[in-house]
């Protein structure tokens, strides 16, 4: 698996992401500066990590979405390449037009930093094949604007097409208002593009890949990607 991790001013999770990718794949990720106009040759996974790109000015991800490197990412995605956006990366993908909807202020207007539970809605995608369908995993969140919103038709289309891959839930897998940490429409924590090759999610799976962290539930996402790409090679 040859990964490229994008780096924007204000991003602060790129090293965490690169470490997770190496732990699972055994390969170093290329760190790609936002001013680059091309991705490294042979890249088969692009990751847009979390943080506060450009200080979250204008809107979260709005400035980063217009960086030169994002033209290369859009082309990469159009050609079928796998793209993963986490937290601020999810916001950037939405602002870039690679995913529908927008991430708004959390419903209670407070920054949330804690572990949450997610239900894996399906496991027949590159981003979920490391889990079982319906499996509940625990991963951290750290965001102030993670409230996913889209118009009613878009949400219905996402649901109908099976494009909601991760959903906030209880430890037992129950979905409801009391388990929806940020007010996201339909308890959405992660969605995939129409072609299924671009995933955006607010939680941070890269922070739960090592035993020392007390939980390795995030490892399945990266292991599934590595398995998928190994088969495709």
Curated annotation (Swiss-Prot):
Compartment(s) of residence: Cytoplasm
Pfam families on file: GATase_5
The Glutamine amidotransferase type-1 domain, residue ranges: 3-233
Pathway: Purine metabolism; IMP biosynthesis via de novo pathway; 5-amino-1-(5-phospho-D-ribosyl)imidazole from N(2)-formyl-N(1)-(5-phospho-D-ribosyl)glycinamide: step 1/2
Sorted UniProt keywords: ATP-binding, Cytoplasm, Glutamine amidotransferase, Hydrolase, Ligase, Nucleotide-binding, Purine biosynthesis
GO terms under cellular component: cytoplasm
CDD domains per the UniProt record, alphabetical: GATase1_FGAR_AT (cd01740)
Catalytic activity: N(2)-formyl-N(1)-(5-phospho-beta-D-ribosyl)glycinamide + L-glutamine + ATP + H2O = 2-formamido-N(1)-(5-O-phospho-beta-D-ribosyl)acetamidine + L-glutamate + ADP + phosphate + H(+); L-glutamine + H2O = L-glutamate + NH4(+)
Active site, renumbered: 87 (nucleophile), 204, 206
TM spans (from-to): none
Keyword Nucleus among UniProt keywords: no
Binding partners and assembly: Part of the FGAM synthase complex composed of 1 PurL, 1 PurQ and 2 PurS subunits.
Function: Part of the phosphoribosylformylglycinamidine synthase complex involved in the purines biosynthetic pathway. Catalyzes the ATP-dependent conversion of formylglycinamide ribonucleotide (FGAR) and glutamine to yield formylglycinamidine ribonucleotide (FGAM) and glutamate. The FGAM synthase complex is composed of three subunits. PurQ produces an ammonia molecule by converting glutamine to glutamate. PurL transfers the ammonia molecule to FGAR to form FGAM in an ATP-dependent manner.
Name under which the protein is recorded: Phosphoribosylformylglycinamidine synthase subunit PurQ
Lineage: Bacteria, Pseudomonadati, Pseudomonadota, Alphaproteobacteria, Hyphomicrobiales
